[in-house]
C-alpha cells in the first residue's frame, strides 16, 4: 500500500534525509561547468545537480536556445542567465548523452549500468497521446484544486467581473477590510500604527499556509507523485511550494497591486511600499517578477503544467531517489512543451523561457527566505507560522 502525506499536514512530519551515495566526489570536487559543488560524475564530467538537470533537459527535450556570440562566463551566480553559452560549455567540456550517468546511485546500480549497452536516448519519448492525457489530467486537477484561477483573476483585474474588489490603500481601509468587508475578523489582532507591518506580515502567512495546503492536494493528484518515497514527497513540497506560490501569485497582480481573499480585496502596491522596514520589502520583488512573468501571457492550462513541473524537480537536496523524480518531471515537461507549441504558435522560445523562469523563482524564494529569517530575528512580535517555520528550516 502506498504511503501518503496526511491531508492537513503537508511537509511537516519528516525532515529530509541525505542520500548515503552523496559522499564520494561531491565533498571536494567542483562542477566543471559553473564551479558549484559537484554532486557526482554526470554525463562524462563532474557536475552539480543544476548543470546535470540543465544538460539532461536540453538533450531530452531537444531544446534550442537563442544564439549568443558573447561567450558568456558561466559561474554559479549567473549560470541561468545565458542558456546558449551554458549548453556550449557543457559540450566543450565533454558532457555527452552517450556518457554513463553515475551521479548519486548505489554501487549495484552503477555496475548494472556499466554492464548494459548504452543507447542514444536515456528514455524513449512518451507517445503523443500519453502526453495529451497527462496534460488533461494535470489541468483538471489544477482547476479543481485552486478556485482563484488566472482567468478569474484577470476578469476581476480588468473589470470584466460584475463585482469589484474592496480597495485597501491605507490604515482606514485595512481596518474596514479586517472588520469583515474582505476577511473574517481576527479576534487576537489589534491594528495600531506600530503594528501594521506585523499585521500585514501575518496576513501574508495566512495566505501562504492556505496555498501550501492546496498545493499539497494538487501534488497528490499529479500522476506518479504518490509512487515516490514519502521522504521525497515531503522534500519536493518543502522546496517547491514557495516557488509555486510566487508563480501563481503573479496571476493576482498588476502594476498597481494584488488581489487578496479570493478576489474580494485589492491591496495597492503603494500601500505595501509605505509599510515600515523591513515589511515594505516583502512584496516588491514579487511585483518585479510578476511583470516579467505575466508578459509571457500564460493561461491556466499552461500554468497547471508549469506548477507541476516545479513541484516534481529532481535536483532538490535530500531526495532518496532523484532519478525517479526526474523521470516524472520529464514527462510533465514533455507535455508542457507540446502544449505550448500547440497553443502559443507565435512564441517558439516560450518553453526555454519558462525553464529560465524556474531559476528566477529559485532566486526569488532564496531572497524571500532570507528576509523572513531576518524579520524573525529582529521583530519580536512577528511570529512565524509553525508550518512555514518547518518549511524554511535548513532550507537556505
From Swiss-Prot:
Subunit structure comment from the entry: Heterodimer with the retinoid X receptor.
Recorded name of the encoding gene: ppard
DNA-binding region: 28-102
Chief location category: nucleus
Keyword Ubl conjugation among UniProt keywords: yes
Protein name: Peroxisome proliferator-activated receptor delta
Region (Disordered), start-end ranges: 1-24
Function: Ligand-activated transcription factor key mediator of energy metabolism in adipose tissues. Receptor that binds peroxisome proliferators such as hypolipidemic drugs and fatty acids. Has a preference for poly-unsaturated fatty acids, such as gamma-linoleic acid and eicosapentanoic acid. Once activated by a ligand, the receptor binds to promoter elements of target genes. Regulates the peroxisomal beta-oxidation pathway of fatty acids. Functions as a transcription activator for the acyl-CoA oxidase gene. Decreases expression of NPC1L1 once activated by a ligand.
Keywords on record: Activator, DNA-binding, Metal-binding, Nucleus, Receptor, Transcription, Transcription regulation, Ubl conjugation, Zinc, Zinc-finger
Known tissue expression: Ubiquitous.
Localization per Swiss-Prot or TrEMBL: Nucleus
